[in-house]
Design a protein with these regions (language model features):
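Short hydrophobic/aromatic-enriched beta-strand-loop microsegments
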Residues: 30, 47-58, 126-129
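Short internal beta-strands
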Residues: 28-37
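Short, glycine-/small-residue-rich phosphate/pyrophosphate-handling segment
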Residues: 110-134
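Short, acidic/small-residue loops that bind anionic groups at enzyme active sites
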Residues: 95-115
Length: 134
């Protein structure tokens, strides 16, 4: 499973805590993240994470392109709906693409936990079957 990680600045520490809590499950998957999020997650967990550009410098667009090409299976996007800054990822573009390509997406820690537990139980195996990987 290819999981993309994005976090607004005010949610990056929460992303690190989430990844630390679920390091065992995440370690069994391929992780992709935007610039600063990679460093924070890797420093907290030691997990290998494929590095993209920072969100405000094209990283969100890289993830969007990967979604469009079928290269992302899940998006964990910890957003700050109140304090998002200019230059942070375009939320609606990413969410629209996830809807168009049937990509499970979490925009907060509660939904991310539901997806991670579903991944652990095998509830999301249909994704790789649909993409012809198993």
């Amino acid at each position: 499973m290819r999981i993309a990680l994005i976090a607004h600045d005010s949610r990056k520490e929460l992303m690190a805590q989430f990844c630390t809590a679920y390091v065992r499950i995440l370690s069994e998957n391929d992780l992709i993240a935007t610039g600063v999020t990679v460093k924070i997650v890797h420093d907290a967990t030691g997990l290998p994470v494929r590095t993209l550009y920072p969100g405000g410098r094209g990283g969100a667009e890289q993830i969007a392109a990967m979604i469009g090409c079928g290269e992302v299976d899940m998006l964990l996007f910890f957003r700050d709906p109140v304090g998002a800054k200019p230059g942070e990822p375009n939320d609606m573009m990413l969410l629209r693409l996830c809807d168009m390509h049937t990509i499970p997406v979490a925009t907060n820690i509660a939904t991310a936990e539901v997806l991670i537990h579903g991944l652990e139980r095998g509830d999301l195996a249909w994704i790789e079957l649909q993409r012809g990987r198993k």
